[in-house]
Amino acid sequence: MGGATILNGSNVTATGSKTAEKVFGENAKKDSPQKLAEDVSNESLHTNDENLTQMMTENIGDAIDFISEFADLNYGKAQTQTPEHSIDRQIELPSSSSYELVKKLAEAFTKKGGQIFLDARVEHILQDKEGKVTGVVAEGRKRTLTVHENAIILSTGGYGANLDMRGKESQGLNYYGPQTSTGDAFQFLAPLELQTKNIGWYKVYPHGVEVEPGIAKLTTYASKKATDMGAIYVNKEGHRIVDESNVYAKLRNAVLEQTDKMAFLLMDQRTWEEFYHLLVLHDFTEEEIQHYFANDGKKSPIFVHGSLKEVAQKAGIDAEQLQKTLNSYEKFAAQGKDEEFDRDPQFLHNYEGDEFYVVEQKDRFATTLGGFVTGADLNLRTKNGERVSNIWGAGEVIGGANGHDSMPSMMNTWSISSGYVAANNALLQLK
């Protein structure tokens, strides 16, 4: 239960909500659904479905206020306000984990009389003589479950774990999403001949380490903190690759261009200590980090420390060029002017001491951006353009709202707002 959402840090936008007024005060009035929609369009290079984007941005405020009251969620200002957003609007839960979100929502739902069936994988749909969907059949390890319903909200997630559905764009990228994201709905809804769009689009992020072949863990909080403290990204050739304080899309694209699609974060002792603290806070254990260092750079994930020459040799970086790169960066930091990438001077900091840490950084994805086609009403559409009157979609299974590249916090924004709208539309039809 929880899908890809349960793996993230609970970040979401609060545009138009009472929650935003509480968290951001007067500054919340400077934001608007239109401003958020413009940011979405700009980030996705206008590949987004404007109708879905508008629906998302106009409803996220009410949706956040509803779930906050329904499940007693105490949202606060997110630790990181990412530069992709033109204004501070990102909030998160105290635990910085969507596990808290899913757990509390599930508890509140069952207290209201709702039922949650685990170990129940939908295998096929039930239809009447006219072809209308009347329910589903799910299989578990010990039972078959048949559910008859007049209204169905489809929130089965994406297809990132299904290698047969993955396209060229995902090649060479590590996956950190749930292994349950197998695109089941695209199989069991096949009899309806539904429209799909953008299958093969993925939300690709930087800040990953490959903990198993093809499987990643994210280091976003730690990596962002490190670059705020002045850390730099280098490639195997020992060169800097990007303005480390730029938006995530710039960093992501720069990493994809490097040898083996990999970069390295170079840190001093003071930066590593902050980096380490945030790793342990967000999904890593002290034991596994020690294990990574014990590998001494011989296999992924690469975590090494020592002198500059030692970390270069262990990580497979050109040591001579790395020294030249560091010397140049130190000069830029001292003069307050980055002559190579024009990095914001507030993030230019000299390295301290002679102990260095290097951690690999690879791009990764958990969520897919393509899916079924709907209108702003979120009813699924057939290939003939007909509206499926009693099935609504919500979350990752629907493609289009964020286009080809979503901003940070926008996948949660889409899942929460679309779920809210789909549920309201279903209730209206049932009345």
Range-by-range predicted roles:
Residues 14, 154-155, 393:
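Redox-cofactor binding/interface segments in oxidoreductases and associated redox assembly factors
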Residues 124-126, 132, 321-405:
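A glycine-rich dinucleotide-binding beta-alpha-beta segment and adjacent secondary-structure elements
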Residues 226-228, 366-368, 408:
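Short, small/polar residue-rich loop motifs at catalytic or cofactor-binding pockets
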Residues 186-190, 195-314:
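An anion/pyrophosphate-binding glycine-rich loop and adjacent beta-alpha core
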Residues 146, 275-282, 370-431:
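C-terminal structured subdomain/cap of oxidoreductase catalytic cores
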Residues 6-115, 231-233, 237, 270:
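Conserved N-terminal/central alpha/beta ligand/cofactor-binding core
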Residues 142-143, 147-212, 409-412, 421, ...:
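Glycine-rich loop(s) and the adjacent beta-strand/alpha-helix scaffold that form part
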Residues 93-150, 186, 190-192, 372:
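Helical element adjacent to the flavin cofactor pocket in flavoenzyme catalytic cores
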